[in-house]
Amino acid sequence: MSKERPKRNIIQKKYDDNDGMPWSEERVVRKVLYLSLKEFKSAQKRQLCDGIDDEGKGPNASLSNGQLNGSKGGHKEDGSRSQRKDGGGEYSVDGPAKKRPRLHAQRKFAQSQPNSPSNTPVKMADPSLPTPLTHITFLSRRKPKTEDFLTFICLRGSPALPSNMAYFGCSQDEEDLEDEDEIEEEKAPSVASTSCQSTPKKGKPHGKINGLVLNGHKVHKDKELTPRSKARESSVGRDRSERCDESEISHKHTAATAKSHNTNGHNYRRAAEELRKQVSKVNGLTRASSVGTHKASGKKQKDFRLPSKTVKYTATVSKGHVTYTKAKRELVKKAKLNHSKHGASAGLRAYSNNHHHNSHHATSNGHGRPQLSHSGKAQSINAKTRKQVLLSNGVHKMTNGSRLNGRLNGRHSAREEEVVDRPVRQGLRNSKRRSDAMTLLGAVTESEETKTKQQTTEVKKAKVQPSPLETRSKKALNQFKSPNIVTIAHSITEMAASPIQKTGPAPPPSPPAAPASPSMPQNPAIPEPARQRPKRASAGKLMFIRKAQQRAQTNPTLNRTTSTTSASKSFKPAEPTHTPPPRLDRDRERERERERSRARYAALGDVPIFKPSSREFQDPLVYLDSFREQVESCGLCRVLPPTDWRPECKLNDEMRFVTQVQRIHKLGRRWGPNVQKLACIKKHLKSQGISMDQPPVIGKSFKSSAFRSAFVCIGGCEVDLARFSELVCDLGGMQQVMDLKKWSRLADLLRIPKSAQDRLAKLQEAYLQFLLSYDLLSPEELQRLEQEVRAEKEALERKRGPLEGHSDNGHHSLALPRYEPKNGLNGLSHRNGFRNHHKEPDIQRQAGRRRLFAQEKKGEKVECEETEEEMEDEGVLSDQHKCIYKGRSVSLTTFYRIARNTMMMYFNKEPGAAEVEQDYWRIVEQRDCHVAVHYGKVDTNTHGSGFPVGKSEPFSKHGWNLTVLPNNSGSILRHLGAVPGVTIPWLNIGMVFSTSCWSQDQNRLPYIDYLHTGADCIWYSIPAEEKTKLDKVVHTLLQANGTPGLEMLEKNVMISPEVLCREGIKVHRTVQQSGQFVVVFPGAFVSRVCCGYSVSETVHFATPQWMNLGYEAAKDLKCRRIAKPFSMEKLLYQIATAEAKRENRLVLSTISSLLKDLRNIEMKQRQELYEAGLLSSARYCTHDHNQSPADTRKKPRKWLALESSERRCQMCQHLCYLSMVVQENENVVFCLECALHYVEKHKNCRGLKMMYRYDEEQINSLVNQVCGKALVRSGSEVCNGSSPIKPPAKRGPRKRESMKITLIPLPTHPSKSAAAAVS
């Protein structure tokens, strides 16, 4: 009901139960109304059906004429009625409706009499029909149409009303106009195969009054089956098979409420009177219960809803549990108590009085009770299973049941079914009344069992064609041959949906107190776990107890009665010891983990936290320098801005960026249980010709036909195939999952968010494509496959070392783009900081490399080819060393949705930092589940900063605004200009578990991070002073054979802080919250874990104290052949040029020694190349002073096409600034050191030319100038070098512009007049 519903506050209509009352009260009224309506209809129809009881008294008469062949006689009418009334609950299992039906206005007119005042005309039987009941046969379960309502309203009570609408339940479709008798007989074989076309949500309770039904059930069924033709076919067969059940219920209950069978009519009248009283009491906020309506009690009703939309079922059109008012709750409680008492006694008396005409009456309750014993969810998954198994039992030689279609299968009385089945209702507690009734019933079961068998042995000869059954029913078909087997099958199917016993700590009350015969096991309350759907709360427990239950099976006789798709092979009494331990152990283990987590993180040192005042919070570098020495021992600190500093985060929701896909379970060690099983699956798929590079993704769409696992924009969640396979096996296999429609449950267990579009269909598709063939392998094949994968892994590690140390050539593409600044060569900045793979230059470069290094790289090429061949041979293990993959381009809005869905996968509510931290390290260390999250780094130069940048916006010029910080006068990086990833801030966009692995900035630069918005971030830090110890510890922990530990750590490896602390390394921890700064100091090793969706912004800065550390870091990167984001040579020369004019003696004194060392190395290498025979050299500048600008423009600009990234040395990735050696024809660049190695090796300098920016005189002049100003106070000159010292000459502003240089063709020797000035 919507919130606006109460506006229609019109309550004067006494019987209009839809207006002006709360939903909860409306459902209560509906239930009681329905009881009264059913009795009212029964009392009137009884006059038309007086002959039914007499005909059904014979043991065979009603079975042969009324139930089995009822389609050819009036008895079918009776069965149809009985089915519609008593079989309402039966629909809950077999009905096809999947969705909760909506309430339509037309339900008020679907059947006027039951929902109308007493003056409503009574619909009389058509006198032209053969019997007073024949017209009821034409009732359909199809949903009535509006036109039919109008026809019915206009013509009701008149002979003009069509016979098929006499009781209004079907439209005049061609399917409904067919003879119902012929339909039933022709379509009976399809009952079992089509019984699970859909999954009803809730069940409808039995309305057993007198064995006659107010044309309810069959009409209801036909309506529900309208959308599906197969479901239509099954409805007829179900109607036919259900008549016996309802008839049996009605007559047995009649016997229980009357002295003998001859007084049934009087009992019906008394029941009618009581029900009328009941309606009147409910209208007066009181509620009673009649003897004959125990099955429609409130407690029974509240857990079920009927999918039908007509008014006949308004008493049960509800979903979920009824929320009663206090007064009504008490009344309903009394009604339930009365129903329970009457039901227990009536069931026993009915059994003793009516067992002799089982052929007709004792079968009326058939399958209805068990469906009511559990909630609609359990019924929906068991709809097909129970229908087919029971049908096969009844049709094929069952001897204990009274029905041929398997509805009873050994149920000996209507009350027996009710009492036995009630305790296993899903999601509800078992009351003491039901337990007592069920115990009382057990005493009668044994004494009456033999008589029931004798009277039902003739049933198996009935004329019903067997229907083609599913796999499970086929097996049951061949096994249910004897009375023992039949009764066992009855208990199997009866208990198919009792999740409480399966997941609870102990089985609910059951009849073991009463002695049971060998053919009737004492486990009617013991569920068959494979065929039941547990409560939502217990859904997660199923996977942990399936295997334990399967191992506990020891009874082969009972096992033979199970189906091939059954998940559990045992029908022994439930062993509660198998159920609670997994859950208890898991809870205890979680608690122990929490305690360990608290202890481990308490051992970590906390970082300093500073809270500057508004006055101190002005210049960040000045403020940080005040406590720099104190904090460097921790590696980082946290700064809490003043309360009045809160800039608004302004980001474009539609900005797009490329994400990283992080496999969290592989961030520690690459190999684990989950990865191993996934490798086995991939290896098996490869043998089948199926390639699977990554796990499939459930979401909006798939991208490729073979893999279909590209990153999905909305709801993209990678499927854990290894766990998926285990869950399917735990649920009984693919066939069991398909039969019981457990895909939704599987999706919930896999924690796939419901917002993912078509998650169930794609989950099923993923299983069929990737897992079905694997799960069909025998245990021997699985073991062999696992051994082969382990052998491959061990062989791979023997060749290349641990997986964590394997190189990944594509790791640069996952890092933050590093851009080359505009340094004067061509005025261009590179787009992504790495080689721009244009087609033509790439081809030329590759060709030049082949020609230049044909001899030198011959051995290396052979090794590379061998490595490629090895990786091809490795097959499924070729990428096991990877844990971070490139994602797809998404918008910020889409990323937020993915982050939200990911959070829902792992946490039910917003978690705290400690909870995320605990689960994160459990995933990393245990590696038993597949966890993939996304992470993004975005350049603010392209997409904009989160800080205000407008001149008029507040905080746009504040010193702590990270877009302003790079230009701070105290930061020496300002001399570099705009370098994305260094002096241009970048955004870090993460979600829960998004990780920045242990790392140290490659240039040892400090940086500041500000958390704009979102969840907390957990930071860990190791100070720079722990570097040596950390290298040894990591080398030992990762078993790095010859690989330095720090290099291993840089390959995206996460090691728990607890482990590092045990090894004696100081680790500090802090939690950054929104609006706080984290400052990381030079050389510190840090890692970060996001606790949810968050957006932070980071930028580097550097003070003069960093220069020595940065210079050593640059030399280390060159030796390790790692590309640097900027040139250290350029930074030194730019600082020297700018600070010499400002006479900043502090900075000059810091860089003077570094500048001298750089000059000495440069001059030495130039001299060595000259001596090795490299005589050709040229200087690149803006233009040659001996030529006019016009002549310069006419010359071909050969090097202008080369972008900045091409000036990296092709050997060591060193960014050449002062000089380089080029191969003119092939555009290949060397640094001086690598060029010297090449010339010495090949003894040939053909085609090589050295290009230099500054000549020797200029370099010496700049070094002397810097040294002189740095030591002016002491009055001494100690800037000694290999080159003569000359005073710097004055240079005009025009020559100062020569720093902006473009590459042009140069003469072989530099012009003597081209003396560019350096200022």
UniProtKB/Swiss-Prot annotation:
Q: List the disulfide bonds.
A: none
The residue ranges flagged as biased composition, category Polar residues, are: 61-70, 109-121, 191-200, 372-382
Keyword list, A-Z? Chromatin regulator, Developmental protein, Differentiation, Nucleus, Repressor, Transcription, Transcription regulation
For this chain the motif Nuclear localization signal maps to 96-102
Q: Where is the composition biased (Acidic residues)?
A: 173-185
Where is there biased composition of kind Basic and acidic residues?
74-88, 221-251, 413-424, 583-598, 798-811
Quote the subcellular location field of this record: Nucleus
Q: Where is the composition biased (Low complexity)?
A: 516-525, 554-570
Tell me a GO biological process for this protein.
Answer: stem cell differentiation
Primary location recorded for the protein, binned into one broad class: nucleus
Mind telling me which GO cellular component terms the entry cites? chromatin; ESC/E(Z) complex; histone methyltransferase complex; nucleus
The residues covered by the ARID domain are 671-779
In this chain, composition skew of type Basic residues spans 1-11, 98-107
Q: Which InterPro entries match?
A: ARID_dom (IPR001606), ARID_dom_sf (IPR036431), JmjC_dom (IPR003347), JmjN (IPR003349), Znf_C5HC2 (IPR004198)
Ranges where the JmjN domain occurs? 607-648
User: What start and end residues bound the annotated signal peptide?
Assistant: none
Residues spanned by motif GSGFP motif = 944-948
What are the GO MF terms of this UniProt record?
chromatin binding; DNA binding
Task: Map out region (Disordered) in residue numbers.
Answer: 1-23, 50-130, 173-265, 351-382, 396-478, 499-537, 549-599, 798-818
Q: Which residues form the JmjC domain?
A: 954-1118
Q: Where is the composition biased (Pro residues)?
A: 505-515
* Recorded domain comment: The ARID domain is required to target the PRC2 complex to its target genes.
Tell me the subunit arrangement. Associates with the PRC2 complex.
What is this protein's function per UniProt?
A: Regulator of histone methyltransferase complexes that plays an essential role in embryonic development. Acts by modulating histone methyltransferase activity and promoting the recruitment of histone methyltransferase complexes to their target genes. Binds DNA and mediates the recruitment of the PRC2 complex to target genes in embryonic stem cells. Does not have histone demethylase activity but regulates activity of various histone methyltransferase complexes.
Q: Which family does it belong to?
A: Belongs to the JARID2 family.
* Name recorded for this polypeptide: Protein Jumonji
Please report the organism this UniProt entry assigns to the protein: Danio rerio
